[in-house]
Amino acid sequence: MKACHVATERGIVLDGVLFQSGQQTDTIVIAITGIHGNFYSNPFYYNIGYTLNRSGIDFLYAQTNDAFDRMQTDNVVTGRKEWIGSWNERFAYTDEDIGAYIGYAEKAGYSHIILAGHSLGANKVIYYLAHNHDPRIAHFLLLSPADLDYMMSGVSGQEKRLIRRQVEQGYGNEMLPFPFMGWVSCIAYTAWDWLFSGLLNNVFTETDADFTQCSNITHTGALLIGTYDTFTDGDPTGFLQNINDHMPTACTEQAGLHRRDRT
């Protein structure tokens, strides 16, 4: 297990952790984290890494901009220190954040890359695959993607109006006067992305929702969710089945829908 540091196109350095099997392997699983899904808050990633290692597969725990609420990192373009986190993430960073980790794996010599994502990280993987038919990626793995419509249902109308007004008046980079969703301290632009951008709002409980991103994916892969998942409006299995139904590769032998009764 070793730390890895990956620079994005905008210069921000993201920190990940590489679990190496100790065997000669060309296969790696890159796991894109969800919000606050850092190496310290999710110890189950140790189990994933060590389990894959025992099968001769390397594992890269890939923290993105929102892995922590706030942390300091380097910007290799400006040469300065910067503060990043869930407090100022922009969803438009998704392509270059994921692309940086894929580039890291390719440069390290891996030719069989499985791109995984957990929670909001799964939504990011969907976004990336919908816009980048990247031949370096062999398959995808989506772990409990987040239903943003359900998550946003707890944001009051008054809070939505305040966020919209703050952005429209030119104060998007200012902190909100309240915790977004009740637990995220962030700037108005970040809350705007969650609520109004639609960039990562790509999975739904409704069968007739806009599944354009899912339908644009040409890779094959697998989906996994726990039946205790609380971000799916009460029906985790149906939620995952609905996503699978909108995947154009779902009928191929490589794709699959997997259910476990506990999480």
Region roles according to the model:
Residues 1-23:
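N-terminal cap/lid segment of alpha/beta-hydrolase-fold proteins
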Residues 22-73:
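Short, surface-exposed "cap/lid" segments of acyl-processing enzymes
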Residues 103-168, 195-196:
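Primarily recognizes the serine-hydrolase "nucleophile elbow" in alpha/beta-hydrolase
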Residues 230-239:
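Conserved alpha/beta-hydrolase "acid-adjacent" motif
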Residues 244-263:
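Catalytic histidine neighborhood in serine/cysteine hydrolases
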